[in-house]
């Protein structure tokens, strides 16, 4: 059985991860971490996730016994990433990271840590989204030379970053396939007199409303026809189950930086 620990157990994804691991046939939850100052310290993980007591209490990572942990899953905030990575490197534990909205310094820290431990880092752990990424690359290969490309994403009102990490990941695979640099060809939102559309650009549009779990569309529009690749998530368990799958896959892997395309054999 694969023994998993969670960073950010009291967050929205942390609570769903507790439920996903509880339902898993291949993994068990051995530790759940929150900040030492959190009011959730000492709470039973099952109560935290709303699934009834499980006999494991929430604790602080710095005082934990990592000898009983095989893999760590981190869905916290960007500002917590570097400290969490340092602890995983110190303890020599593989880590699955789902934190999005990273700046360049945090991405560099991820690269450095991957020289010492195996890491899976993905903007989205849904199997369907990763199939969408694969299909977007194929569509860009065939239609990208002439089609206008737009990426539309929607999430709940509480999401703090925009566009979503998944939307950016879709843009990156399309830009890579077309030999473009997303940092120079991306257009984020439009307003006022924008002039005619530059066919070399990749447009992004963002919706933040209600309790939308996650919706992404890659639109390839040519004259006379268009293709829309859409994924809609109806439950966060979709992402949590994918992260648990990645954690099980990551155990005993060599140091390096992997993604869900590797986990699913799509790379």
UniProtKB/Swiss-Prot annotation:
Task: List residues binding (S)-2,3,4,5-tetrahydrodipicolinate.
Answer: 156, 165-166
Gene that encodes it? dapB
**Keywords linked to the UniProt accession:** Amino-acid biosynthesis, Cytoplasm, Diaminopimelate biosynthesis, Lysine biosynthesis, NAD, NADP, Oxidoreductase
Family the entry assigns: Belongs to the DapB family.
What is the taxonomic lineage of the source species?
Bacteria, Pseudomonadati, Pseudomonadota, Gammaproteobacteria, Alteromonadales
Name recorded for this polypeptide: 4-hydroxy-tetrahydrodipicolinate reductase
Q: Which organism is it from?
A: Pseudoalteromonas atlantica (strain T6c / ATCC BAA-1087)
User: What residues form the catalytic site here?
Assistant: 155 (proton donor/acceptor), 159 (proton donor)
Q: Which GO terms describe its cellular component?
A: cytosol
UniProt-annotated binding residues for NAD(+): 8-13, 98-100, 122-125
- Describe the function of this protein: Catalyzes the conversion of 4-hydroxy-tetrahydrodipicolinate (HTPA) to tetrahydrodipicolinate.
């Amino acid at each position: 059985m694969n023994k998993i620990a969670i960073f950010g157990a009291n967050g929205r994804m942390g609570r769903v991860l507790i439920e996903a691991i509880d339902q898993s046939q291949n993994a068990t939850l051995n530790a759940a971490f929150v900040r030492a100052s959190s009011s959730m310290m000492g709470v039973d993980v099952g109560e935290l996730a709303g699934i009834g007591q499980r006999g494991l209490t929430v604790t602080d990572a710095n005082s934990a016994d990592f000898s009983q942990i095989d893999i760590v899953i981190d869905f916290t905030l960007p500002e917590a990433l570097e400290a969490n990575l340092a602890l995983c490197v110190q303890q020599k534990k593989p880590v699955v990271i789902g934190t999005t909205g990273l700046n360049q310094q945090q991405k560099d820290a991820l690269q450095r840590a991957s020289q010492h431990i195996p890491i899976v880092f993905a903007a989205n752990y849904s199997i369907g989204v990763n199939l969408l990424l694969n299909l977007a690359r194929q569509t860009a290969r065939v239609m990208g030379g002439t089609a206008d490309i737009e990426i539309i994403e929607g999430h709940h009102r509480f999401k703090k970053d925009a566009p979503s990490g998944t939307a950016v990941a879709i843009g990156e695979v399309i830009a890579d396939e077309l030999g473009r640099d997303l940092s120079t060809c991306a257009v984020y939102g439009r307003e006022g007199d924008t002039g005619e559309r530059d066919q070399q650009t990749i447009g992004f549009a963002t919706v933040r409303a209600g309790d939308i779990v996650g919706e992404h569309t890659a639109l390839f529009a040519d004259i006379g026809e268009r293709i829309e690749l859409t994924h809609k998530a109806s439950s966060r368990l979709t992402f949590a189950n994918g992260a648990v799958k990645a954690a099980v896959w990551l155990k005993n892997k060599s140091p390096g930086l992997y993604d869900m395309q590797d986990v699913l054999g799509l790379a």
